[in-house]
């Protein structure tokens, strides 16, 4: 008779424990009910990136001295620097500079180690294309100034959202 009573007690304890676990899960679900939604409607709303966000690289052609430090510190030897040695002034003259963003890992080493600060990271992250060859940016495409998300009037940022009345 005692084994049946102990089995019944164990069954009751397991039932109470299961109900407690279900209640804990339900309380967590209810605690999320009064939070603001995290999802943004992407093409029309964008998150404002942080100050140190590593997006598309901006290149200033006039500042570059063709030292190729960016190529040496890049883990995948990505930037292509074409230069010509000017014999009369004994300096390098930059002819072409390009980066393939289809291969770039956005580590930021080139920006960090550039001695003339001709490279900088922007907050631009929309680089998707239908053709991978369009991701190979030359010095003209790299020199294009990025439009700030805050200044873009077609985009509603999280800061510009109407307040939700509670």
Curated annotation (Swiss-Prot):
GO cellular component: chloroplast thylakoid membrane
The family this protein is said to belong to: Belongs to the complex I 23 kDa subunit family.
EC number: 7.1.1.-
Protein name: NAD(P)H-quinone oxidoreductase subunit I, chloroplastic
InterPro entries on file: 4Fe4S_Fe-S-bd, 4Fe4S_Fe_S_CS, NADH_quinone_OxRdtase_chainI, NDHI
Cofactor(s) the protein needs: [4Fe-4S] cluster
GO terms for biological process, alphabetical: photosynthesis, light reaction
Biological role stated in the UniProt entry: NDH shuttles electrons from NAD(P)H:plastoquinone, via FMN and iron-sulfur (Fe-S) centers, to quinones in the photosynthetic chain and possibly in a chloroplast respiratory chain. The immediate electron acceptor for the enzyme in this species is believed to be plastoquinone. Couples the redox reaction to proton translocation, and thus conserves the redox energy in a proton gradient.
Domain of life: Eukaryota
Pfam short name (any one): Fer4_10
Gene: ndhI
GO MF annotation list: 4 iron, 4 sulfur cluster binding; iron ion binding; NADH dehydrogenase (ubiquinone) activity; quinone binding
Taxonomy of the source species: Eukaryota, Viridiplantae, Streptophyta, Embryophyta, Tracheophyta
Domain 4Fe-4S ferredoxin-type: 55-84, 95-124
Subunit structure: NDH is composed of at least 16 different subunits, 5 of which are encoded in the nucleus.
Primary localization: plastid
Catalytic activity, as annotated: a plastoquinone + NADH + (n+1) H(+)(in) = a plastoquinol + NAD(+) + n H(+)(out); a plastoquinone + NADPH + (n+1) H(+)(in) = a plastoquinol + NADP(+) + n H(+)(out)
Keyword entries, A-Z: 4Fe-4S, Chloroplast, Iron, Iron-sulfur, Membrane, Metal-binding, NAD, NADP, Plastid, Plastoquinone, Quinone, Repeat, Thylakoid, Translocase
Residues reported to bind [4Fe-4S] cluster 2: 74, 104, 107, 110
Membrane topology category: Peripheral membrane protein
Entry note: cofactor: Binds 2 [4Fe-4S] clusters per subunit.
UniProt xrefs under SUPFAM superfamilies: 4Fe-4S ferredoxins (SSF54862)
Organism from which the protein derives: Enydra sessilis
Subcellular locations according to the entry: Plastid, Chloroplast thylakoid membrane
Binding site for [4Fe-4S] cluster 1: 64, 67, 70, 114
């Amino acid at each position: 008779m005692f084994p049946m009573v102990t089995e019944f007690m164990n069954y009751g304890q397991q039932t109470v424990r299961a109900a407690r676990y279900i209640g804990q899960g339900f309380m967590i679900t209810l605690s999320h009910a009064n939070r603001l939604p995290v999802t943004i409607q992407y093409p029309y709303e964008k998150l404002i990136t942080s100050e140190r966000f590593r997006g598309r690289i901006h290149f200033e052609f006039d500042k570059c001295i063709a030292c190729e430090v960016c190529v040496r510190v890049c883990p995948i030897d990505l930037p292509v620097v074409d230069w010509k040695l000017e014999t009369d002034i004994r300096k390098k003259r930059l002819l072409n500079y390009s980066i393939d963003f289809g291969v770039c890992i956005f580590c930021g080493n080139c920006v960090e180690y550039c001695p003339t600060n001709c490279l900088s990271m922007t907050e631009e992250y929309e680089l998707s294309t239908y053709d991978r060859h369009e991701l190979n940016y030359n010095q003209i495409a790299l020199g294009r100034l990025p439009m700030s998300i805050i200044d873009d009037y077609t985009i509603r940022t999280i800061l510009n959202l109407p307040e939700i009345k509670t």
